[in-house]
Curated annotation (Swiss-Prot):
Keyword Transmembrane: yes
GO annotations of cellular component type: plasma membrane-derived thylakoid membrane
Organism: Prochlorococcus marinus (strain MIT 9312)
GO MF annotations in UniProt: electron transporter, transferring electrons within cytochrome b6/f complex of photosystem II activity; electron transporter, transferring electrons within the cyclic electron transport pathway of photosynthesis activity; ubiquinol-cytochrome-c reductase activity
UniProt protein name: Cytochrome b6-f complex subunit 4
Subcellular location: Cellular thylakoid membrane
Similarity section: Belongs to the cytochrome b family. PetD subfamily.
Function noted in UniProt: Component of the cytochrome b6-f complex, which mediates electron transfer between photosystem II (PSII) and photosystem I (PSI), cyclic electron flow around PSI, and state transitions.
Length: 160
């Protein structure tokens, strides 16, 4: 069985296009050699030219030299670790902080067993999963913002 669509040469519109030399792209353009030999190298070379051009026109500036004898007042981790950092910073017992972080993957593993629904169903018709997802999202954003603030203002976000 062929995957190519056979042209209907009895179609007068197609015959008129073929007579004018316009019908060769009517059923698709072949990948070999058109895409692989002509289009892909142009895209690859264009991407390389853009990267090299941006590197030449806007080089990255070097930061201050490292001084091991002058540490900053508060060392912050990368932005994606802010919620975890906030949990470890706020919880008084560090072992409890690590235990709280293990609840996140455990909750994600238990979630499919809480709501036994079809995986193709509408997610808005799954109230438990949606409420847990929204709670986790807002908690992560709240903890991430709190990690950027001093510890005395981190839980209230400086609002109270």
């Amino acid at each position: 069985m062929s995957t190519l669509k056979k042209p209907d040469l009895s179609d007068p519109k197609l015959r008129a296009k073929l007579a004018k030399g316009m019908g060769h792209n009517y059923y698709g353009e072949p990948a070999w050699p058109n895409d692989l030999l002509y289009i892909f190298p142009v895209v690859i070379l264009g991407t390389i030219a853009c990267v090299v051009g941006l590197a030449v026109l806007d080089p990255a500036m070097l930061g201050d030299k490292a001084n091991p004898f002058a540490t900053p007042l508060e060392i912050l981790p990368e932005w994606y670790l802010y919620p975890v950092f906030q949990i470890l910073r706020v919880v008084p017992n560090k072992l409890l902080g690590i235990a709280l972080q293990t609840l996140i993957p455990l909750g994600l593993m238990i979630l499919p067993f809480i709501e036994n629904v079809n995986k193709f169903s509408n997610p808005f018709r799954r109230p438990i999963a949606m409420s847990l997802f929204l709670f986790g999202t807002f908690l992560t954003i709240y903890l991430g913002i709190g990690a950027c603030l001093p510890i005395d203002k981190s839980l209230t976000l400086g609002l109270f």
